[in-house]
């Protein structure tokens, strides 16, 4: 892996399952089995990312467990508990033009239709009805805001997203 590529974190390894090195998997993907659509995985062990292959996986009650290449004992599996699971950015599926990965929206500057810089997207929250951008306001915000919450509703509040330019144009009152 080249040093300038930051892996996309998709989950983490949980506790051991059994004596043969299987591990529980916590997936951050939409569906828990979605994490297995990607191969190979990168595992962050002792601060270093390394490639690992999933040999097999299965449901175990309400959990999902996996057997990883080179992990054949409970002791070795215990060493991997809580390690992050990632993939290279180019392994991500291409999206239609009007869809975006959250990771690409975080760090974007948010500008309203009057040209007011509302701040930078710090987080995104899934609410059920629509995603919400948590925008960290600039230090000298004219409206005294520290953070703004903007619904991510394209065509209504979100007018344009420029991932390359790291900018989002919104129809939103900065006083909200």
Swiss-Prot record:
GO terms (BP aspect): ribosomal small subunit biogenesis; rRNA processing
Named from the GO MF annotations, one term is:
ribosome binding
Give the superkingdom in one word: Bacteria
Ranges for domain PRC barrel: 97-176
Record-stated family: Belongs to the RimM family.
The record's function comment reads: An accessory protein needed during the final step in the assembly of 30S ribosomal subunit, possibly for assembly of the head region. Essential for efficient processing of 16S rRNA. May be needed both before and after RbfA during the maturation of 16S rRNA. It has affinity for free ribosomal 30S subunits but not for 70S ribosomes.
Q: What is this protein called?
A: Ribosome maturation factor RimM
- State the species of origin: Shewanella sp. (strain MR-4)
């Amino acid at each position: 892996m080249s040093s300038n590529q930051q892996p996309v974190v998709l989950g983490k390894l949980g506790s051991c399952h059994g004596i043969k090195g299987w591990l529980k998997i916590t997936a951050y993907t939409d569906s828990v089995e979605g994490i297995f659509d990607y191969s190979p995985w990168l595992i962050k062990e002792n601060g270093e990312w390394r490639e690992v292959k999933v040999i097999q996986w299965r449901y175990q009650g309400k959990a999902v467990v996996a057997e990883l290449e080179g992990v054949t004992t409970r002791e070795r599996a215990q060493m991997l508990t809580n390690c992050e699971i990632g993939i290279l950015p180019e392994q991500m599926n291409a999206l239609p033009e009007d869809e975006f990965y959250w990771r690409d929206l975080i760090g974007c500057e948010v500008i309203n239709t009057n040209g007011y810089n509302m701040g930078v997207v710090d987080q995104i929250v899934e609410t059920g009805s629509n995603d919400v951008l948590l925008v960290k306001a600039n230090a000298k915000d004219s409206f005294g805001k520290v953070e703004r919450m903007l619904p991510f509703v394209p065509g209504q509040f979100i007018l344009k997203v420029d991932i390359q330019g790291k900018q989002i144009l919104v129809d939103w009152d900065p006083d909200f």
